[in-house]
Amino acid sequence: MINYNFINNYKNLNIPIIGPTANMPSGGFLYLNPLLLFKDLGQGLISLTWQKLQTIWKFAENCDLIMATGDIVVAAIAYSTKLPYVVFLSADSSYYEGRINLGLILPKLLNNSRCLKVFARDALTAKDLKLQGIGKTEFVGTPVMDNLTSTGKNLHLQPELFTIAILPGSRLPEAGRNLCLLLKLVREVAKVMGVNVCQFRAATVPILMFELEAIAVSEGWQYQGNKLTFLTQEYAIEVICYEDAFADILQHSNLVIGMAGTAIEQAVGLGKPVITIPGEGPSFTYGFAEAQTRLLGSSVQVIGKKIANNFLLKMFSRKIMFPMIVPKRSPRFIVVIAE
């Protein structure tokens, strides 16, 4: 399984995808709902996995080194190639539980003589792994923060207004459902803050742009170009969507409202306060959002413990306060969410 947003990114960098790909019902988040395994199996998970393994083994015949990114699964696949390999444990962090449960197999894979190096996603995890006997572990930085320089994309921002980034995620159809929920929250936030105070910019994946018109119709918004507009007799709310301005939107935002994984980590890495909302999933549920707060700390605030309805969104929007602006041209916010 591979996120189709990643496929597009690889293609843009002229990096070929050598094996078959498919979107599975679980989205790769079986630990959040193990029952989705049966749906994955029904969608051909076993045959897909076997095809991937065959592709990897054949391709490895012409390789000198395997770079595996993920968890025990990719580490095991790298081991199976019989080549030297390096593992980046991107899916594991000691911030979740204080100590990673490595089990019986993963230490053998990481301590194998063909495993040349293990990279951890943070310094705490590197220390934990070393204490558990994985002496070749290092933390040298977080790769997801490497390419977040603003490109100079014109976001048509008004400098005197607060900028709020909207991050619905990258996996469809979930990202579409997430955006519907986020648009409901945008309406409530605009009521609290005022439409002449804030402006909204959404960073979406290219495939979601094709769904914007249907999303607008379902939520009572108007759609034109890359702009979603909600009209009332008193005011208009605009959410302008971009498929190619993720870094620019994050860099210019004063607050992030999102339902995503890596994108939220990147926002926090840039020092942005973040509000998240549990959704239907399969990936961004309350369980995921709660774990994310353990990973990222108080920079992330989760609204509620279940899928938000209109009443909850209205209630929590009134608890969001933006009282401090220092200095005038560089807004900073204290975001308070009280339950």
Predicted regions and their residues:
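Nucleotide-activated sugar donor-binding and catalytic core shared by glycosyltransferases
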Residues: 1-339
